[in-house]
């Protein structure tokens, strides 16, 4: 199974290492046509206003929205911002894939970044992980279809809806594989079930 990593900016190489640990094939996505050759997509961290300009210039908004209708998408940090319904910054154009509103850089500057122990609930199982927050966005509203997988300081920091998963932290920096596995093995299996049932 080939998983695309949006390679416009951000530290996308570490996501590739996580995918390889799960026996998934990483593929860098730099052009909209690259989406035709992958079965899922990661929108990595970066700077969300810059990402808005790069995605707009390359025509990614329409192509990712269409791709996400039938394929799993995972967004981390700025990737979560891009997947949200709305960010509290008019410079940012979002994809509207997750029914959440976001406040960007809620954890402060990069020097205030931190690593925290979180309890994550996936598939009815709870497990602790170390989560690295870097200028992390904060979810300030979420809709009824959102499944909260983890919270930090009383706010959701890992959410899922349908085939889409958003995280305000960077699991790839701590070698955490459970979210990539959930997005591209568990959620992807739902697609196969739908196809078989059709």
Task: Identify the role of each PLM range.
Residues 48-119:
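Cysteine-nucleophile active-site neighborhood
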Residues 43, 75, 167:
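Redox-cofactor binding/interface segments in oxidoreductases and associated redox assembly factors
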Residues 89-155:
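Pocket-forming structural segment of enzyme catalytic cores
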Residues 1-57, 63-66, 72, 177-181, ...:
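N-terminal beta1-alpha1 cap of cysteine-dependent amidohydrolase-like domains
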Residues 10, 135-198:
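C-terminal and late-domain segments of enzyme folds
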Residues 25-27, 130, 147, 165:
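Conserved beta-strand segments of alpha/beta enzyme cores
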Residues 1-2, 126-129, 159-165:
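Beta-strand-turn-beta hairpins that frame and shape the catalytic cleft
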